[in-house]
Amino acid sequence: IKLSEEMDMIIKNLLWYIPNIDSFQATKNELISDRIYDEFSFTYIMEQMGMKESRDVRWIGQKEVISKEDWEFFEGEICTNCQKILVAKYSTLSKINTLLTTIRNSIAHGHFAIVEDYIIGFNLKLSSKDPEGLRKAIIKIKPKPLLSALEKLASPMGKELLLAYAFRRVGYDVQEPKNRSRDFDLCLEKNGKKYVTEIKSYRGNTY
């Protein structure tokens, strides 16, 4: 595959550097791996990518496989009008970790293609029961906004960003203070009542 310089860097990041994957270079990020953040983190990333989980993502059980018809459809035609994710959800991984691991595996095994600004990847799980492999995931996305969203969550202000997003999702008006060293981390208002939030680390965990 002949890639542009930008797409070449994107593929390398997806293969080696995205958080929490099985790679020596990968960093750890609790906002991506911890179940307590999972729903808001995944929804945030979907929005940043211009996707909706209810419309564009189909989860299947970890013992299920993607139908041969769906697999052959995505292998045969690459539409660049929409992004889609079909993936087996494992109980040991968060939604984001499932997505990132799937993308990384499809690249590592060479079962992917680049069309314009899309990557489409396929994830087959080796099995003695099926010599062709078990069809576990199809990913057709624009990787650049995915990496941008991950970078924001991994930034020093990632926790504040995600908490502000979560509070807005449940109806709070969120104001970020002008002076964080002196004020609280977030100022909230809902139904005429005002609240303040301060984020603290305790024994390695953030609250």
Protein language model regions, located:
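Acidic-basic catalytic patches of nuclease active cores, encompassing PD-(D/E)XK
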Residues: 154-178
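Conserved catalytic cores of phosphodiester-cleaving nucleases, focusing on short active-site segments
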Residues: 167, 186-188, 192-205
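Short glycine-rich, flexible loops that bind phosphorylated cofactors or substrates
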Residues: 115-116, 204-206
